[in-house]
Amino acid sequence: MNETSNRDHQVTSKEILDVAFEKSKSKFTTPRQTIQDTEELQSYQQTKRKEFEQHINKNRLNLGQWTRYAKWEIENNHDFPRARSILERALDVNIQHVPFWIQYIQLELSHKNINHARNLMERAINTLPRVNKLWFLYVQTEEMLKNYPMVRAVFERWLDWHPDTSAWDAYINFEARYEEKENVRTIFKKYVHEFPNAGTWYKWIKYEMENNRDDVNTVRAVFESAVDTLLSNKSEENDDDEEFATIISSWTSWEVSCGEASRANEIFKLLLDNKTNKLEISDQTKSSIYTAFVEFEKNFGNKDSIEQSVLIKRRIKYEQEIQNDPYDYDSWWKYMTLLQNSSNKSDLENAFKKVTGNVVHDKHKSIKWRRYIMFWIWYAFWEEMTNNNPVSAREIWNNCLKVIPHKSFTFAKVWIGYSEFELRNSEDGLAKARKILGRAIGQTSINKPKIKIFKYYIDLEKKLGDWNRVRLLFQKWLEVSLLTTSSSELVIEKYVEFESSIEEYDRCDSILSSARQLSENPEYSSSFNLQRLLEITVEFYKEEMQYDKIREIYRALLDKDPNAHNWISFALFESSIPSAEQLEEYLQGDNEEFEATVDESQIESTRNIFEEAMTYFKDKDDKESRLVIIEAWRDFEEVNGSDESLSKVTKRLPVIVRKRRTVGSIEEEYIDYIFPDDESKKLPGKMSKFLANAKKWAQQN
């Protein structure tokens, strides 16, 4: 009886999990090990050492393990000899590992083993003399111990290895901290010999000026030595050294502060005198020195000498740059600004003729062309505004248009500038401006419409209130876009905005209908982005609250192009418009502003569209599109649906499986999607077939 009951009782998975959970609640604590006598201590030490040795043998290059081993010996056993032995063994493995050297040294220092640490630092710098970090650690340690003679000795040994400037700077800072001025000067003498550049000399000068400014002879001697050395050792690598100009500026400023303005003036003249060929100073350095000289003249020169020297110097500089490169428009601009400010009319006019006479040869609309055209525009405005010569200005505008290769590219700012010029300076300026803008459209619409010109012309006619001309311009813009297969959505959008602004809603409807018809014409379809055109159309009809019209457009679109994106757009549209109740409430209310909220009726409409899309792609056996639809539906439910509706949609997501098929004579792997909707319909057939086979088997037996 008991056997029968045991056989009938089956252990469930829940019971197994309950037992496992109860067992997991049991608390297991590691037994605490206590050491009672010396033998147990030795046994424990032997065990730990064996563990460390095993870890080290596994990876001898892991120097961190060696360090942990040594620290354990010190912290737990106070066995420094054994710890040092371990660290020495680690050095045998990799003696060039700088962080390990530092850890070894700091370990000794932390336990106040100064002599051991000093011996280690000696070994370290002898082993790795090119590593600055070890030298820095050595000198910092000795300075901390106030062993200053030893610090100097270490620095001197370090300098024998010809280190970089950081070592020299550290040595100088050390001596400067303890105000050992003579020692600092001695080091600087070696420093400038080792690094004979302007930066090194400037450090010395800066030190003397900060600490010994009243010692005039010494400071001047350093300045003179610096300049003499740098000029005599001029080479390509320091030829344009900006620090040299800084030294000169500092020298002259210091001389002035000492009441030696005449000496400072002589220094500038000596360096800037072009007749003197003894000093080879680069143009860049000389320019920097000249800038300092100008500042000097402002403070100590007379007005005439200052202005004359500045203008002449800058003019010569710009003329040389222009002569070297006639297309250096930056120099041209500075040069002509200088001439304009100096009221030199004839020279400025000649400069305008020269710069506009050098036509750019680039075949594309390059930055050179853009800068070149700006000089033409400046030239025309200068003649009109400054010289009051509209005849000459008109000729300049025409000549500018002649040099532009309009078949390749053009400049809207020139056409617009010319038309505005005629508006300002002619009795029949409006007619001339329209003629210029019409000519611009004709000459610049060979490859594609020049949008800036169309926009400017349309805005002009809007200001004049000539709606018929505005419509003609929009139609011309659209015509050019279609003939040149350019994007036409912008002109449609702007055209609709214009008609809507003057409340011509029937015209807007006609424009959008015509645009849709043109987009369906194979001859013009390449000029339209259907998605953007749809957005413009939907946006307009939404503003007009013609939601049924939008639905008709979507249905027509789905008949022609029933892709997943269009279905999703249609579905989401239903949730972006107000419900009938919300619309009725708005129409009966007094509020001018209206904000639609998503309620259940809108959500249900969106779901119906998604369901319709799923059915459509299921009938077409387009599983990829079904996947896109169901994922979009899921995203929609996450935002607007309930947990129940989201769960229903989530359960309809397909299972991704990998299958193989033979294409031709080649077997390939592909991804298939198994939808639960499809499997649920197949299940009854499989079950009936299984039952039929079972019945047949039973009859045979």
Curated annotation (Swiss-Prot):
Coiled coil feature spans: none
Any single biological process term in GO: cis assembly of pre-catalytic spliceosome
Example of a GO MF term: DNA replication origin binding
Superkingdom of the organism of origin: Eukaryota
GO cellular-component term (any): post-mRNA release spliceosomal complex
Subcellular location: Nucleus
Keywords per UniProt: mRNA processing, mRNA splicing, Nucleus, Repeat, Spliceosome
Any Pfam family the entry gives: HAT_Syf1_CNRKL1_C
UniProt keyword Protein biosynthesis, yes or no: no
InterPro entries, alphabetized: HAT (IPR003107), HAT_Syf1-like_N (IPR055433), HAT_Syf1_CNRKL1_C (IPR055430), Syf1-like (IPR045075), TPR-like_helical_dom_sf (IPR011990)
HAT repeats: 43-75, 78-110, 112-144, 146-177, 179-210, 214-253, 266-299, 309-341, 343-378, 388-424, 545-576, 601-642
SMART domains: HAT
Gene3D superfamilies linked to this entry: Tetratricopeptide repeat domain (1.25.40.10)
Family: Belongs to the crooked-neck family.
Function: Involved in pre-mRNA splicing and cell cycle progression. Required for the spliceosome assembly and initiation of the DNA replication.
Record's subunit section: Associated with the spliceosome.
Name under which the protein is recorded: Pre-mRNA-splicing factor CLF1
Gene name of this polypeptide: CLF1
